[in-house]
Amino acid sequence: MASQNIQHFFHPDSGTISYVVADNDTKEAIIIDPVADYDVQRDVISYESAQEIIDHIKKHELHIVAILETHVHADHLSGSFYLSKTLNVPIYVSEGVKEVYSQWKDELCLSELYHFEHFLLENEHMDFGHSHLEVISTPGHTPSDLTFKIGDALFVGDSLFYHGTGRADFPGGSAEKMFESIRKLYELKDSTEVYLCHNYPESEDKLVYKTTIGEERHDNVFVDEETTQTQFVEKREGRDHQLPPPKLIKPALEYNLTAHHS
């Protein structure tokens, strides 16, 4: 059975966690949810965080074959475009990205949608080395949310947080769909490892980047194994009404959909 080395990278400014997943037999690897750095005051994009990933790749002599995004991020700028150009590898996103683009095109006066090399659908598969990745569609946070299953590891984007969930109030978001997506993940065995996209620790040494399906089924404050859809929707929508929009929502969506920054 194929095995993988999973290395996480934490971006404190946005609370985002990126991953490099390498097939141990062949050193072929993928990057999931990389981040670019954005100085709001100076309106400058830089790539120190992406360079950390490149340094890791070089140190371990990995061969990157793909960059994958779990969804269109609204709280940070993606490092995918920079890494794709630097490493000469394709970017894989959800087919739902097209819907997100349509919802925001006029409001944000967006230029053309970036020509992503691959638009992924439910149950698609890809291999890197001897490792096998399965695409699970998990809409709710946005229409574009995907979960990637590699062996007994899940990369869940913003569908699940540690003992919580992402918000569901963005255009095209749906608490009902999020509930259905999470329940689908809860059907997997309890020992399945869940690699998170966000965590907001007081300090980096308290970062939680991984949980399990069993732990979330028992301890998730928004949706445990006994929560009904009605209960979840009421709690999730109630919380979302209290939350302000992400500070970087406009520049993040523009950049992450078009690779342009105006």
Give names to the regions the model predicted.
Residues 5-9, 20, 123-150:
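Core dinuclear metal-dependent hydrolase active-site scaffold
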Residues 36-130, 218-219, 224:
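Active-site HxH/HxHxD metal-binding segment of metal-dependent hydrolases
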Residues 14, 37-39, 72-77, 98-101, ...:
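Active-site environment of divalent metal-dependent phosphoester hydrolases
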Residues 2-60, 147-156:
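Conserved beta-strand hairpin/beta-sheet module of binuclear metal-dependent hydrolase folds
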Residues 2-5, 180-193, 197-262:
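Accessory terminal helices/loops
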Residues 143-188, 194:
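A contiguous binding-surface segment within folded domains or other stable secondary-structure elements
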Residues 32, 63-72, 92-94, 138-140, ...:
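Active-site neighborhood of phospho(di)ester-bond hydrolases with catalytic His/Asp-centered motifs
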